């Protein structure tokens, strides 16, 4: 799929298809008005006849419009002009791409990027169009024996920008959008893999491949023997019921000209399958517990995007791969575990395992003297109750870092919402026998999980993203979303000083 930007009049575009917008009720966008004028009112006459109202997602494909060089013109319903926001814009792009693909338009010039979207500039509109296009065309069918193929798939998309001065802005948006889309695809592919393939060793192999593909990336794999030597007893306890060895992949990206620049650290929970262990989960939808490694998948995707963008910063990505299974050697409710930090944990529920893996990873990364640490995890069902499936949960111990991440979430459209983590909640994870319990008393489950993790982050600025509600979509159309790769990449772009300014 090839993307480019240009600035020109619609009637002069020689393409398989031109894409322009129509607002409710039957109001032509400025670009559509130009086409209507050059075609002697051909388009407006169709609208008066009632062929298209302009409601969001409505499509009307016109052939051989008078005096227009392109073979076809696709009219796209955009709803009411004043109500066109970022969510509706992305939905319109998605429906447009689907229509172009279905109708055999192998190339198109898209003028939707010239529409006014509340609070968004040309860079954002082009970048979101690229990301949405790539996401719309994503398929995961490598395990199907019969793979459906589009007869004449969309291969080239040109986005028009209002002035030539904005061409460089559009080109940068395409570069950034393609990198984000590449990371999202990598994350989705990992998440959608079946757990009999995507075990901790598979995650490690993908981390090694990333180092093979980019000179700026090195990867170290830490297996169970080294974990024992490091004292990562909590991490090991979670995986000891599985025949698949726990493996932690440490991916280092060095892009800063200053070799001593402190790195940003990203940590991803990588439970390649979470049965719940001895505290076993209900069988309904247990298949979706292959998605319990989506935190690790998103860190992997963000590291891939980062390497493609060649950003001038240092970043360490940690993929905490593990499998939580019941068995004769599995850890039990009632066990007391000594973590790598020396703190002890009473296990109340073996299905609250993500925090037991993450706490040792959080201690491990102290050796990098990080500028900040962000962990990403499908950690709590309570986050789904609190925020649903649209917004990720955010907690942390450093207000400026939390604000940076919220800002990146707004810029990217991959939203997060900060939850409180005041001292009162810490009492909910107290234990009569150990320093803490791995499960809080009823209420505020996402916050008490954050409180647990916070006890292992005293030496650096830290934030936690709970993506339990946003990492995948369940049900018949189940699949990984690739989130929060866009948020993470935007955060890294901002840290590199490459946030967009028109």
UniProtKB/Swiss-Prot annotation:
Function: Presumably involved in the processing and regular turnover of intracellular proteins. Catalyzes the removal of unsubstituted N-terminal amino acids from various peptides.
Any GO BP annotation: proteolysis
Catalytic activity: Release of an N-terminal amino acid, Xaa-|-Yaa-, in which Xaa is preferably Leu, but may be other amino acids including Pro although not Arg or Lys, and Yaa may be Pro. Amino acid amides and methyl esters are also readily hydrolyzed, but rates on arylamides are exceedingly low; Release of an N-terminal amino acid, preferentially leucine, but not glutamic or aspartic acids
UniProt keyword Manganese, yes or no: yes
Protein name: Probable cytosol aminopeptidase
Gene that specifies this protein: pepA
CC cofactor note: Binds 2 manganese ions per subunit.
SUPFAM superfamilies (UniProt xref): Macro domain-like, Zn-dependent exopeptidases
Organism: Photobacterium profundum (strain SS9)
HAMAP family: Cytosol_peptidase_M17
Lineage of producing organism: Bacteria, Pseudomonadati, Pseudomonadota, Gammaproteobacteria, Vibrionales
